[in-house]
Amino acid sequence: MNVDFIAGINNLGEKIYTCEPFKTSFQNPFIVALIITAVVLVVFFAICNPPVDKKRKTKTAIYVYICIVALLFLHYYVLNHQLNDIYNKSNMDVIVSSIHDKYKGGDEIIPPISPPSVSNELEEDQPKKIAAGSKPADSKPADSKPASSADSKPLVPLQEVIMPSQYNN
């Protein structure tokens, strides 16, 4: 087959599918509700044949019309209110607008949330404190004497000894 012919058929199918009336008719919730109601009615009449009696036929017709109106309003409400973003916006618009709403336009910088401080921490979880300029307690020889409190230096957290804080100048 000719390649141009196949490409033309594919292009024609794409044009038919993306035809503007086709797209807008299925994006309109009322049209979708009408189609769903028609399918429900066809199934209803296929399963339950209406009675032959004239009084019962009128009563059945009234019930069917009430069902049609109720289904139309139900489908219209569901499609229009709950799926509004799908019919009226593209997915990217929904994502961008949700980010915009969440961060109020992105102008504000939201500070990170710090974890809450726990008052009953275990002793090994707390940073070890050593005297500034001295060696850690594990590296002292066994025969060394403990320093008296008068001549010892103030205790500094071990993390600050290894990595001095930028803010303590």
Curated annotation (Swiss-Prot):
Record flagged with keyword Protease: no
Taxonomic superkingdom: Viruses
Low complexity bias located where?
144-154
Q: In the UniProt record, does the keyword Glycoprotein occur? A: yes
Q: How does it sit in the membrane?
A: Multi-pass membrane protein
Keywords of this protein's UniProt record, alphabetized?
Glycoprotein, Host membrane, Membrane, Transmembrane, Transmembrane helix, Virion
Please list where the region (Disordered) is annotated: 107-169
Q: Which residues are glycosylated?
A: N88
What is one cellular component GO term in this UniProt entry?
host cell membrane
User: Where the protein is mainly located, per its record?
Assistant: host cell
Cellular compartments annotated: Host membrane; Virion
Membrane-spanning residues where?
28-48, 60-80
Q: Which family does it belong to?
A: Belongs to the asfivirus B169L family.
Q: State the protein's name.
A: Transmembrane protein B169L
Q: Which organism is it from?
A: African swine fever virus (isolate Tick/South Africa/Pretoriuskop Pr4/1996) (ASFV)
